[in-house]
Amino acid sequence: MLEKIIRFSLKHRWFVLLFTLVIAILGVYNFQRLPIDAVPDITNVQVQINTQASGYSPFEVEQRITFPIELAMSGLPSLDYTRSLSRYGLSQVTVVFKDGTNIYFARQLINERLQEVKDKLPPGVETTLGPISTGLGEIFMYTVTNKPNVPISQHYNPTELRTIQDWIIKPQLRNVEGVAEVNTIGGYEKQFHITPDPSKLVRYRLSLNDVVEALERNNANVGAGYIETNGEQNLIRVPGQVQNMADIENIVIASFEGTPVRIRDVAEVALGKELRTGAATENSKEVVLGTVFILMGENSRTVSERVAAKMKDINKTLPEGVEAITVYNRTTLVNATINTVKNNLLEGALLVCVILFLFLGNIRAALITAMVIPLSMLLTITGMVENQISANLMSLGALDFGLIVDGAVIIVENCIKHLAEQQHALHRVLNLEERLKVISYATTEVIRPSIFGVFIITVVYLPILTLTGVEGKMFLPMAQTVIIALLASMLFALTFVPAAVAIFLRGHLQEKENWLVHYLSLGYAKVLRRCFHARRVVISAAVALVVVSLGIAFHLGGEFIPSLDEGDIAMHAMRIPGTSLTQAITMQDLVEKRIRQFSEVKNVFAKLGTAEVATDPMPPNVADTFIILKSRKKWTNPKKTKPGLVQEIESAVQQIPGNNYEFTQPIQMRFNELISGVRSDVAVKVFGDDMDTLLKTAEAISAQLKQVPGAADVKVEQVSGLPLLTVEINRDVLARYGLQIGTVQEAVVIATGGKKGGELFEGDKRFDIVVRLPESLRSDPNVLRQIFIPLPLSKDGEQHFIPLSEVASLIRSESPNQISRENGKRRVVVTANVRNRDLSSFVSEAKKRIDGQVKLPSGYWITWGGQFEQLQSAYQRLQIVVPITLLGIFLLLFISFGKVRDALLVFTGIPLALTGGVFALWLRGIPLSISAGVGFIALSGVAVLNGLVMITFINKLREQKKVYLKDAVLQGSLARLRPVLMTALVASLGFVPMALATGTGSEVQRPLATVVIGGIISSTFLTLLVLPGLYYVFHGRRKKGQSKSEPQEQIM
């Protein structure tokens, strides 16, 4: 089959070149369609169920809303687990499905279950589903603010800015292709407030509810069918909707002593502010912040660019003096990451080409070999587009051009050798027919081991396809891309390379060693003889190195995946529970002023509390602060590191009392939270029933965690300390007055929280009309006690009132700030970040300390979460994958040689290669990670290539030329020096830029590249120095029947 392909490629060589050109053009076309991102989206399939329940305490939210919804979600197909959050007035249940579940199918299932549970929820409570987005969903953020050169007198107030955002900017952005949602926080939603005067209401014998009912009865348009007159149909409408504030003021509530009482007689009508749950700040001033969420499955770079382009158009339509400023754009990170990958690949390709020129000694031959790189990449891009693989840090992170050209190198090198030998034998330049025949023979001679080597590397990556969860989403694209690239290189090695050699390698050819190969050969011959004669010592030393590396590996420590340096900082600021939103904004202003003193900081903005869509519900006392940094080139001290800057910022803001902080990065923060429900590297989850016991146990665990070296930002989840003002109604007194509890509740709700009585339309815009007491009265507890409660009408039809204090008392108390649950069980989380230490050793030490020092009450237990949870899952999976990979390699080697002995000989390249990888990590101070683990998997395939080539050649010498064992070993080793060095150098140098890069995203690629480079170096030494001796030892015994006089050694 392979021979037929080669003969076809040579016979129709110009067609092959034309076909190659078509593939290249297709690749260029697909490059325009290739989705580009920073990293793969590793978020699990999840749906958020948000329920607003105004006035409900966390206990009531948990009991009446969260628990019924959790119960309804039980038993859903493909359900993984549920977790929930119950806060004052808000329930959020997150339903996590198994990987591969269709998000639209999952949402359909949840909607069906919500319909079933609807009747069990409190009246008036409605559930909504979160946007169809992921942890990487927040791709674009912008602030709506006044232009800096506009006089303060002409500034738009926060309510007007919010109106511009809600009715001008947001609708246009939601129409951008690929946008799932535009979330808003900050400013105030515009409302029309009717603020009654309690004394006037009493004077006219009216209640607060009378005002609401009057508004509801006088603010509607109705249709009354139609009539037919003279053969014409006339529709009948009865408009009654209010058009402006004057219409509201003129609404008649009732008649008092024969005179109509209008709303204007008992209340003021004016523009008002909503009772908001969140705010936004930028550089110590309040702003309106919009966040664009990408639709799941869309490409973030493309959608970000569309949003940015649309934002430019929108800015042209905004009112004079207002602008929307981009404060966060994912494209910046994507471009920086892709630039790092691009530079690594280009530098790697350049290094590979240099090695090809040096070793092949023929410009045309080197160019033919080098052409396989861009051709394979273009075909790989086509494969990525067809398989919906985005180009990102991980998918392109393991591409090694050295491996891609390996097959082509072997073929071209063998063709040059045979062409030169044939020309030398005939003493003339070969004609076309002779050249094609030699090229066909030379290619066929090495194509099987060459293809087999590529096949081994491909098989090595196949087990990575079995990874699941976060590690699967991270490394699956990498394995798929490498496999596609290797298959592409195999195709071009079979077709393009022989055709190109036949066309371009004409004229007189000489296979001569250049100066580099000549001197390397001389030096290698001397070292080889010494190592061969001291082979047992050399083999023993190699075994000792393997043993030492095992000891080092156990002390390297471990982490899940090296954190991608996103370039910016996310700071989670927490104040005392119960801190008002107004006070939190004041404290946030101080924090931002302190942060802006650092010259490295470009911009600071923050989200406080919960936004319009509760994708990330936070209480008012908590703020997510985004610190956007300048380019590293613009830092006053370029030597300063980002961790160093974080420590300086932390020291500065810690001086502001009443705040606690934890530092992370924007994407990392959302990933951690959405995947495991926490925002930190490590989480200790304490499960149980009683909140006080949970909190006490969590505090004890926190105290122990703080003593572990490397612990930072250790804190217990804020679950207590929410101040409540409870209106405790006396049922006995209520009964004496003949009142219903609902009457009292309604009066309090309208007075303090306000009640919507209708809407006022301004063109396409619509705004709520709300009835509540004036701000100066509703915030005063003493006034609250004096709220008038309407009594049932007396016998003479008179309306009388009593103050609230007659039937109820106000009681101050504390409530849980929030109640978190996981799989239906309450939990409290202790979180910590790990700095200047690897994750694995930190958790190991923390576990020992907690197990020894903290006694858990009966019925309570702990689990470890955060990134450590993902690390453990990945390690368990790799414990299965790695042995299967090694077994697969051995079976392939056995199939190749047909002998266990030779298969074992080549297989020995893997332990010493892994040794080099471990030493390389140890020398660079890099802990073991899933990235390094994938590097070891890839290395195990690369490690056997050189051994495969050398053993195959030595066996060939012994079988075909009947060379004695020692001569065969030494001659075969020397003859294979150039291909072994070329393979090793091109494979390792292709990874050098990744190992040394410092750009955005380089930290993720560094462990993998370091492992491969270190492993290839040690594997090359094994192949050149240890393997010859091993071969002699393995094959040195005389076979039965062999003559004793037959020489076993011959002087070289």
Swiss-Prot record:
GO molecular function: monoatomic cation transmembrane transporter activity; xenobiotic transmembrane transporter activity
Keyword Signal: no
Residues annotated as transmembrane: 14-34, 121-141, 348-368, 369-389, 393-413, 450-470, 483-503, 537-557, 878-898, 903-923, 934-954, 979-999, 1011-1031
GO CC aspect terms: plasma membrane
Database matches in InterPro entries: AcrB_DN_DC_subdom, Acrflvin-R, CusA-like
Sorted UniProt keywords: Cell inner membrane, Cell membrane, Membrane, Transmembrane, Transmembrane helix, Transport
Keyword Cell membrane attributed: yes
Protein task: Presumed to function with HelC and HelB in efflux of an unidentified substrate.
Recorded family membership: Belongs to the resistance-nodulation-cell division (RND) (TC 2.A.6) family.
This protein's name: Protein HelA
Species this chain originates from: Legionella pneumophila
